[in-house]
Amino acid sequence: MPSTSAWVDTGLLVALFARDDPHHDSAVEFLKGAQRIEFHSLWLVVSEASYFLGAEGKEGLLKWLEKGPILFHEITVADLPDIRATLKRYQNLSPDFTDAALVTLAGALGIHAIATVDLRDFSAYRLPGGAAFERLWL
């Protein structure tokens, strides 16, 4: 049974499925040691990752996702005011909608760990109460 819940961001998926990515080997090793982690994400993250992947990487990513390694959360219209507030709060970082949605849902769901290559932004983003994200990889 998982002992930790963590968000999966775009960079981990790209690193896992793009063999030429500089973080590929590290991502594969991280995943091998992550059996006790319950992964969460958004379909927006998959969309972003697929933009950076070639045909083989997209195929591998989708086959892997079919096995159910990630729990996906939906964004609803009710989430939009909080996502807008997140975008405004971090406008100096120019966050995209995906990051803002992930940060917003992380606070709402109490999942504070993340696997990401985006060290700059996820070092700056804060959760309710001012806590930083716990980066589990890189």
Predicted regions and their residues:
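Generic enzyme active-site microenvironment
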Residues: 7, 116
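ATP/adenylate-binding site constellation spanning eukaryotic-like Ser/Thr protein kinases
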Residues: 119
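Conserved glycosyltransferase catalytic-site signature
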Residues: 10, 43, 99-100
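Conserved short hydrophobic patches within well-ordered secondary structure
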Residues: 101-102, 114
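PIN-domain endoribonuclease scaffold, especially VapC-family toxins
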Residues: 2-6, 17, 25-94, 104, ...
